Structures are given as structure tokens and as C-alpha cells.
Amino acid sequence: MKSIRLLCLLAVLILLNACGFHLQSKAELPPEMQRTRLEIQSPYSQFARRLETHLEQSGVNVVTALDGAAILEVPVNATRKEIQSIGDNARVREFRIRHTVQFRLLASDGTEMIPLQTFEQSRVYSFDEQDILAAEREDEFLRNDLADNLARMVVRRLGTYGK
């Protein structure tokens, strides 16, 4: 019985390895980013908090002073809600949430390391006017998920500098 379990476990591990699966590790960011100042529109947004967390998890010391620090500029950090579809009774059935982020990385001397980049993600969710509280919770969950995904994308992109 133990040998069957062991064989099954081994088969699963081989299949996962064969398909290219690997655990996500922290991004290796350029050494110039050891100290980084974050200049972001909406500094108290969910995206800003998630970006700072992911940067710190990757070994970046996020600072407020400019002396000797790289600058990560995020001039655009915008979320908008759009009507996706309308039902037969002329009422909204689905919404789309779009989150757009633009960023660029400057060295401590002001030279551009990564030019302005734009990332955008969106999610669609159904709206039920009979259950407005659930729709609000889903809206909030999707906004947080988009913010986290975009923050991860930005950090991964920063990790490609010089490669």
C-alpha cells in the first residue's frame, strides 16, 4: 500500500516537472534598486500597498529620501468600472473592472533604466440587483486581486532589467 502511494506521488511530481511547473520565487531585482523611492499616484491605494510589499519581499528597501535611491515612478494608477452587458429589462447584468498602471524606473542619477511601461488587467462579474451586498463584495475582491496581480507584474518586469 505504501509503495502504491509512493509511486502515485512520484508520478505526480514527474508530471508537474515535465509540464514546467515550478514554485514562484521572489524576483531578483537589479542591485541599483537596493534603495528605492516609490513615487506613485494614489499612494494609499491597494495597488501601492501591494507594490511596496512585493518590493520589500524582493529585498528592496523602500525609502522616502532621494539620496542615492533609485526612483520607481508610477504616474498612472487608475481603476474604472464599466458596464459590460445589459439585460432584456434594460438593467445592468455585468460590469467590467479595469485597472491600468504605468511605471518607469530611474537610476539615482536620473537616467532612465526602464522606460515608461503600461500594464492593464480587467475582470468581468455578474451583477444581481437582488443581492447588492454580494456584488459589492465581489467588486472589492476583484479590485484587490487586480491590484495584487499588477503589483506582481511590475516587480517581475523590474526583475528583467539587464537580462
Predicted regions and their residues:
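Sec/Tat-exported extracytoplasmic proteins
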Residues: 55-59, 105-109, 153-162
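Bacterial N-terminal signal peptides that target proteins for export
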Residues: 1-8
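Bacterial signal peptide processing site
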Residues: 20-23
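Extracytoplasmic/secreted envelope proteins and their assembly/folding machinery
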Residues: 48, 52-55, 98, 116, ...
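N-terminal segment of the mature soluble domain
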Residues: 32-78
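Surface-exposed short loop/turn segments
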Residues: 68, 73-118, 122-140
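C-terminal motif of bacterial Sec signal peptides marking the signal peptidase cleavage site
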Residues: 15-18
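C-terminal/domain-edge helix-coil "capping" segments
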Residues: 133-163
